[in-house]
Amino acid sequence: KVAAKYDISENLGVRASFNTGFRAPTPGQQGTTNVSTRLPQGFPVAVGLFPASSPVAKALGSSDLLPETSEGISVGLVGNLGDLDFTIDYYSIDVDDLFAAISTRSVSTDPTNTDAYANFLALDAAGVVGANTIGGVFYFQNGYDVNSSGVDAVLTYPFESDYGLSVLSLTYGFNEREFESDASGYLNAEGIYDVQNFEPNTRAILTLNHSFDDFALMIRTSYWGESSNYQSGNIQDFDPVSMTDIQLTYFGELFDLTFGGMNVFDEYPDEDEIGDYCCGRIYPSISTISWQGANWYISATKEF
């Protein structure tokens, strides 16, 4: 990694970096075997995750896992306007041979189901025990090359009054992910679409920390931008979501007492409308946005 910073003035600087890296496959990616019953479209199917080096995966054309490699650049501004501190950075990261679980390869003993039947014949020819009981197979591969690029910004503003010290901060991130190589040999149309569209491109967090005498208050609002999901030929667009957390702490002589709430306004992401759910959930199965509603907590801590 090489990084440099140049101060244009007392209040403004430019910084940049270039780095390379690699990531070896984890023991889990290399060695996990896990066969479970899943419910795509509401019907039970035995689906198995197998090591890329296993006879099952080899029969369907897998290759042994190799390390990922990456190159990244960033350039940005850092400075202050009075009491307002800020950083704004652009970044671009290329990852070659990204580890990814391939889209599930269907397996069927029904000759009319052409691709799935061909997979069954391949497993049977490889001597896989119980091949006729498997409904789907997937495994990790060095699948494709991707580029992730975006902008991160952080603004911090402290202010003091007769009522204590407050610090207001805003973090903002915008990210796009694009394929740099053909991924169709590893992902189906749904997988390719979701890599680029399922995660919100925009994320922001506004936080107020306030301290006064023996009390500390934190109010944080998190924002996720628009996203969309592909399932069985259908596309669903999801609206932006905002959730607010509040926490109040009293620092006592005997112990500290904290009371707080997460998602205090009980907000939820859009419900799934195209069948991408599992196990009784009504929200997309791989959603990274909390779907459990508001929850509250109280805790007491004491240092010895």
Task: Show the residue positions of the predicted features.
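Outer-membrane beta-barrel architecture
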Residues: 1-3, 17, 64, 74-78, ...
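Gram-negative outer-membrane beta-barrel transporters
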Residues: 91-232, 299-303
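Outer-membrane beta-barrel channels and translocator barrels
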Residues: 7-11, 70, 81-84, 148, ...
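Outer-membrane beta-barrel signature, preferentially recognizing the C-terminal barrel domain
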Residues: 24-89, 93, 136-151, 156-161, ...
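Surface-exposed extracellular loop regions of Gram-negative outer-membrane beta-barrel proteins
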Residues: 10-68, 92-130, 228, 262-283
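C-terminal beta-signal and adjacent terminal beta-strands/loops
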Residues: 176, 223-229, 249-304
